[in-house]
Amino acid sequence: NKDGYLMEGDGCKMGCLTRKASYCVDQCKEVGGKDGYCYAWLSCYCYNMPDSVEIWDSKNNKCGK
């Protein structure tokens, strides 16, 4: 299992600034993660996701490209 930032379809981190408090927890559980939170009120970070879930990686950042 792995931890990391959820990604939108455009390759950017999944934002959570204007979402309800449980948004990231719900999104993380939807992909099979155990828990999650809105990091610095900006992006969803998840714990214990299946290895098959694609997460944001600074080395392979496609956001805005």
From Swiss-Prot:
Disulfide bonds join C12-C63, C16-C38, C24-C44, C28-C46. Signal peptide: none annotated. It comes from the Eukaryota. Its main location: secreted. GO terms for cellular component: extracellular region. The keyword Secreted applies. Keywords: Amidation, Disulfide bond, Secreted. Expressed by the venom gland. Pfam families: Toxin_3 (PF00537). Alpha toxins bind voltage-independently at site-3 of sodium channels (Nav) and inhibit the inactivation of the activated channels, thereby blocking neuronal transmission. This is Sodium channel toxin 2. It comes from Tityus metuendus.
